[in-house]
Curated annotation (Swiss-Prot):
Family annotation (PANTHER family): LEXA REPRESSOR, LEXA REPRESSOR-RELATED
MF GO annotations: DNA binding; serine-type endopeptidase activity
Quaternary data: Homodimer.
Residue ranges of DNA binding: 31-51
GO process terms (BP): DNA repair; DNA replication; negative regulation of DNA-templated transcription; proteolysis; SOS response
Residue numbers annotated as active site: 137, 176
Matches recorded under Gene3D superfamilies: Umud Fragment, subunit A, Winged helix-like DNA-binding domain superfamily/Winged helix DNA-binding domain
Enzyme kind, highest EC tier: hydrolase
InterPro entries according to UniProt: LexA, LexA-like, LexA/Signal_pep-like_sf, LexA_DNA-bd_dom, LexA_repressor, Peptidase_S24_LexA, Peptidase_S24_S26A/B/C, WH-like_DNA-bd_sf
The protein, known as: LexA repressor
């Protein structure tokens, strides 16, 4: 059981806010949302207290993404968004050469999109988020520019799975099929006109796996 011993009042408030926000929305809050939700004077104060919570073993953080906060041993509960067949649209992903991630997921207004029941039953939408596709590298997999991919958050993948990948140092995010080849990873486009991308495995961080597609009709 998680202990709250030696927590300041502010740290208890932040921990409670993160847990309530995550249960309600299905994804963790950004630092800005914590600041606004608790009326804290600055994001630096929030960041300081998040570091304290992490050092006390109560949360895990991935500082490379804006919503990289996880409460340890938190038991998932049914999400209100799942009952409505809705998932958060968290930004844009490139289906082409990797580009710096253009999304800004630190805003307080997160767009929610409807997922048809015949595509995914509401109870299957736990830990699922959406990204809008930019580019044509996955066209042979029937994913084109303007489509929306549904991503199940996970940090590992099997060979051949279609994943969102962040490339370290470049801070680039791309949508490709994943293949581990020794100490390299091959990021394979589904477009015969495009070449695969080879990256050191240590620089590749999986952000999620494609579990569905909402196709643009434009």
């Amino acid at each position: 059981m998680r202990s709250s011993d030696q927590l300041s009042a502010r740290q208890r408030d932040i921990l409670g806010f993160i847990e309530e926000f995550t249960q309600e929305h299905g994804y963790p809050p950004s630092i800005r949302e914590i600041q606004d939700g608790l009326r804290i004077s600055s994001t630096s104060v929030v960041a300081y207290n998040l570091r304290a919570l992490e050092s006390k073993g109560l949360i895990d953080r991935d500082g490379r993404v804006s919503r990289g906060i996880k409460i340890k041993n938190m038991t998932p509960m049914p999400l209100s968004r799942a009952q409505g067949g809705r998932v958060p649209l968290l930004g844009v992903i490139t289906a082409g050469q990797p580009l710096p991630n253009p999304e800004d997921t630190s805003t307080t207004a997160v767009e929610m999109i409807e997922v048809p029941v015949d595509l995914a039953p509401p109870e299957k939408l736990q830990n699922v988020y959406a990204l809008k596709v930019r580019g044509h590298s996955m066209i042979d997999a029937l994913i084109d520019d303007g489509d929306i991919v549904l991503m199940r958050y996970q940090e590992t993948a099997d060979n051949g799975q279609m994943v969102a990948v962040r490339i370290e140092d470049d801070n680039a995010v791309t949508l490709k099929r994943f293949y581990r080849e020794g100490d390299k990873v091959r990021l394979q486009p589904a477009n015969v006109t495009m070449e695969p991308i080879y990256v050191d495995a240590a620089r590749v961080h999986i952000q999620g796996r494609v579990v569905g597609v909402l196709r643009s009709m434009w």
